[in-house]
Amino acid sequence: MGLKILKNFKKNIYWRINKYSLSKSENIRYIIKSRIETMDKLLEGHSISRYGDGELSLIYKKKKNGINYQEDNIEMRKRLAEILKSDLDKHIVGIPGPLVKIDDLILGEAYFWSKYYYTNKTNLNKYLSKTKVYYDQMISRFYLPYTDKNDCELIVEKLKQLFKDRNVLIVEGENTRFGLGNELLLLAKKVKRILCPPKNAYKVYDKILERIKLENKGQLILLALGPTATILAYDLAKEGYQAVDIGHMDIEYEWYLRKADRKIDIENKAVNEVSGVVNKEIKDKELKAVYESQIIDRISLD
C-alpha cells in the first residue's frame, strides 16, 4: 500500500511540474502540429512515419529487450534515429503531441506523458529538433486519451476521405484485420492485404519492402506493423508511394463507435493491449470470405 501511494505521489509531482512548465515557459519544447493538421497533410498526399513512446525509447536503448512484439535490433534503432531527423519531400514525421500539450488529456494519460517527458528529457532533446516541424502521431489514438472528444468526428471524416476512391493496400500483422467489419474502408475503390508476422516483423523487413514495391505506386499503402511500419513509410515515400503508418487507428475507431471508456477487446481482431496477439476466428462466414478475398500475399519469418 505504501509503495502504491509513493508511486501515485511521484506521478502527481511529474504532472504538476509539467503542467506548470507548459503554462509558463516562453521556450517552445518542440513544434508539433495538431491531429487535424496532421490529417490534412495526409489528404494532401504526404506519407507519415509515427513515433510513439516505444519507437522513441528504442532509439536511445531505454528498452534493451525491445518493445511488445518487436525484439531489439541495432539496425532498426539506427534507421529509426535516421528517419526521425529526416527532411524528405512529401513525408512527415509524427511524434507525440502530449510532449507539448497535456491539458486536453484524461488524468492517467497526463500522468504518463508528464513522467515520460521528464524521465527521458535528456534523450528527447538529443534526438528531437527545436526547429523542425513535427506532426502529431496521436492521430492513431484520437479518442480514448482525450477529455475533449470534439475532434473525433472530424478526424474520422478525414480518415474516410483519405480512403475515398483509392485502391488501398494494407500491410499488417496476421489477425490485425484493419477496417474489417466496420465502414472505415467503405469508400475505398478496392482493398488488398499483405499479411506479415505479428511479432518481430523487422526480421523480414527487406522481404516486406520488396514485396510492396511490386505493387502500383498509385495505391495508398496502410502500414500496421509497429516500428517496422515507421521505417517502411519512409522508404516507400522515397520510392514515390503514399505510405501511412496507421498503427492502432482502426481499434481506436472501434472504441469510438462503442463510446468505450477504457480499452476493450474487439471481435475478430487482435487487440495487443487487451487480448495480445491471438488467432481469433472470424465467425461470420460472409465477413470471412470478404477478408480472405482481399489477401494477396503472406510473408512469414521462415
Regions found by a protein language model. Give the residues of each.
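Structural motif
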Residues: 167, 219-220
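Residues at the C-termini of beta-strands that transition into short coil/loop
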Residues: 97, 195-197, 247
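Short, solvent-exposed amphipathic alpha-helical segments in soluble enzyme
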Residues: 65, 110, 183-188, 209, ...
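C-terminal functional extensions of proteins
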Residues: 231-302
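Electropositive, gly/pro-rich neighborhoods at or near active sites that engage anionic ligands
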Residues: 2-184
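A mid-sequence, solvent-exposed acidic-amphipathic segment
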Residues: 174-218
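Residues at the starts of beta-strands that form the adenosine-phosphate
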Residues: 167, 190, 242
